[in-house]
From Swiss-Prot:
It is an enzyme of class 7 (translocase). This is Phosphate import ATP-binding protein PstB. Gene3D superfamilies: P-loop containing nucleotide triphosphate hydrolases (3.40.50.300). Part of the ABC transporter complex PstSACB involved in phosphate import. Responsible for energy coupling to the transport system. Its EC number is 7.3.2.1. SMART domains: AAA. Keywords: ATP-binding, Cell inner membrane, Cell membrane, Membrane, Nucleotide-binding, Phosphate transport, Translocase, Transport. InterPro entries: AAA+_ATPase, ABC_transporter-like_ATP-bd, ABC_transporter-like_CS, P-loop_NTPase, PstB-like. PANTHER family: ABC TRANSPORTER I FAMILY MEMBER 17 (PTHR43423), PHOSPHATE IMPORT ATP-BINDING PROTEIN PSTB (PTHR43423:SF3). Belongs to the ABC transporter superfamily. Phosphate importer (TC 3.A.1.7) family.
């Protein structure tokens, strides 16, 4: 696990709960003058899968990108409020974003392997944050590729370009690359939307295994996937959090009519 002074100062007013990995409080987000997220407050339980559902443009992916400050890469975007991680608000301007993004990994909708070998895709982020010798790096590469069920498929071609892998293999490689830096939180933005059913099933099985170690937040438009994979489900609509509950209760007895209408296909 990567540690740094960016996360060691704990405000007694927001001391970290061992049961909550991310605590969002009164979060608002703006694309220029467009108010995209409105007063979002939600807890992400540690070592659980939280699925975020809702129609396109409702703010799910925007929220995901707030957690590791990806929005900082684009001018005119800003967030207010709090996202408490390890006792500190990640929106603070003096945060070390390289360390934050190593501890809060992200996998995108479309597989994005780096234009380098399979081995170097895994080693790239590790080299930025740790000084491992070759044997240690080899072990790290094998470990994460094994964990995403990719090792046996690529062990004899680690030096081959990652672009030669299938779409499903590339996405598993991207997950392996994200967990290679040993983050505490893993963010996934529709990670299976571009994959075939077999590859999708493999990713879903993988999530069930990974949540034993990582806190996972996943954006999905597939409500069957949310029901299969998630412990907690949050429904968003027009930039607002409408309801959050356990997956079982959300899909069998939602409290809000908007939630009921969405999950039954009346809109969205």
């Amino acid at each position: 696990m990567i540690q740094d002074s960016m996360m060691t100062e704990t405000d007694p007013q927001v001391a970290k709960s061992p049961e909550v990995a991310l605590a969002v409080r009164n979060l608002n987000f703006y694309y220029g003058e467009n108010h995209a997220l409105h007063d979002i407050s939600i807890d992400f339980p540690a070592r659980r899968v939280t699925a975020m559902i809702g129609p396109s443009g409702c703010g799910k992916s925007t929220l995901l990108r707030v957690f590791n400050r990806m929005y900082d890469l684009y001018p005119g975007q800003r967030a207010t409020g709090e996202v408490i991680f390890d006792g500190r608000n990640v929106l603070e301007r003096d945060l070390d974003l390289n360390i934050l993004r190593a501890r809060v990994g992200m996998v995108f909708q479309k597989p994005t392997p780096f234009p380098m070998s399979i081995y170097d895709n895994i080693a790239f982020g590790v080299r930025l944050h740790e000084k491992l010798n070759k044997a240690e790096m080899d072990a790290r590469v094998q470990d994460v590729l094994t964990r995403v069920a990719l090792w046996n498929e690529v062990r004899d071609r680690l030096n081959a370009p990652a672009s030669g892998l299938s779409g499903g293999q590339q996405q598993r490689l991207c997950i392996a690359r994200s967990i290679a830096t040993r983050p505490e939180v893993l963010l996934l933005d529709e990670p299976t939307s571009a994959l075939d059913p077999i590859s999708t099933a493999r990713i879903e099985e993988l999530l069930d295994e990974l949540k034993e170690e990582f806190t996972i937040a996943i954006v999905t438009h597939n409500m069957q996937q949310a029901a299969r994979c998630a412990d907690q489900v949050a429904f968003f609509y027009m930039g607002r959090l409408i309801e959050v509950d356990s997956a079982d209760r959300m899909f069998t007895n939602p409290k809000q009519q908007q939630t009921q209408d969405y999950i039954t296909g009346r809109f969205g």
